[in-house]
Amino acid sequence: MISFFSSDVSKLPLCESIVATLCLIRPDFPADVVTKELQNRVEEARSYVISEKKIDGKLKKLIELFYSHWKFGSATGVYKLSDVLWLDNVLKTRKGTAVSLGAIFLHIAQQLHLPLMPVIFPTQLILRCDEFNKKMWLINPFNGETLDEHVLEVWLKGNISPTAELYKNDLKKAQYLTVIRKMLGTLKNALIEEKNMELALNVSNTLLRINPNDPYEIRDRGLIYAQLECNHIALTDLIYFVEHCPEDPISEIIKIQIHSIEKKKFVLH
């Protein structure tokens, strides 16, 4: 199990870090099953790409295997967002998000010694390889398709702002810890939306192990505690946020929440 205080998570394999982190959050997370499944996928992929000698050929074969034969991809229809983030479920259903699919694909690629890296683009995680004809090769982890600058600019203008522009910094390699934080943030919000407050609290506490003094995460934990009617703890967290971020417009809303909690009878757990 990872200690965020004594280990440099960014130096561990991404999937290994995610599996260990999910064990902190979900006591029943089947780490051994997930690890074995990942090993099996790696061995199958190794056999599938063995005929290719060049890096770009191996990567193209892996994309073919992952998306066309194994049929990993984005979820459709009605589904719970948390289901496409838990790695055990993603491996079972083969449906995931850009982060969960990207983490699995990246794990397999790295075991095959393919020079792939994660990029936290403003709209989603993407994968990057710099060895293809010495030119940056960008891959959409949802479907394995190659991304070009035009597509990325369309994403920015459609999701961020009509005046948004693509900058070189948007395509820099992301540290694994940054990827994990992004995944956990999405998982936390999904669990809150699904009213699974106990697990959401576990996610929030895990995020605070990574960055113990983050006032925004402390605020979110306070709001989760309020939902769980742990009002005395909720107040401590919410007051911390207001004191540390007095200029944030959200502080006024949080003050109303604090006042509402103070009017209630404390429920001690």
Regions found by a protein language model. Give the residues of each.
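A structural boundary/capping signal
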Residues: M1-H269
